[in-house]
Amino acid sequence: KDTVVIISSVTGNTKEVVEAIKKIKEEVGATVISFVDAKEAILLDLGDYKISYPVNEQLKFFMVADRFMFNNGEFEDYEDMYAEFDKYLAQDLVEVEKQAEPFAIEFAKKHWNDEMHYFVGAGNQWGATYSYAMCYWEEQLWLKTKSITSNEFFHGMFEIVTKETPVTIYIGEDAQRPLSERVANFIPR
């Protein structure tokens, strides 16, 4: 009963997720926060708190996590940071999208028909690496991918990478950065 579960879904009707949330509510009594892209969905009905907004998934998660940390006395700069967000974040996100568009178009032209695309990451970038490959490329674009951690790269994958192999490497700014940099330095150019 002292548990909060945050669930994110595009449709809000995935059978296994719906069953899991029902079980969590019935057996644990957890409070459920539902982020669902669709405006009508079973997961919205099951959520104690509901947000139906189909963009910026990571931003929603971070905002909720930030608030939990603030409420727990672990984020003393919270109010100042969110005052800055209120002033600048919306416009800055639009500007970043505009600036990224030419790169995104060229990347899409180059990789839209990859037979297989590899995504490599570690540390604080592993979640983004994994979900980008699976959710965006496989589920949404129907393109074959493989996500692999940077530390696993040298245990097999490096044997099959050539100059023509499409590889995207996520390099974070945490203690595992050297692992991803090692992969980046190894990849043939």
Residue spans of the language-model regions?
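A generic local secondary-structure boundary/capping motif
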Residues: 20, 40-41, 107-109, 157-158
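Internal helical hairpin/lid segments
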Residues: 127-189
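Short, well-ordered alpha-helix to beta-strand connector turns
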Residues: 2-3, 46-47, 114-115, 163-165
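Short amphipathic alpha-helical surface micro-motifs
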Residues: 31-35, 99-101, 149-151
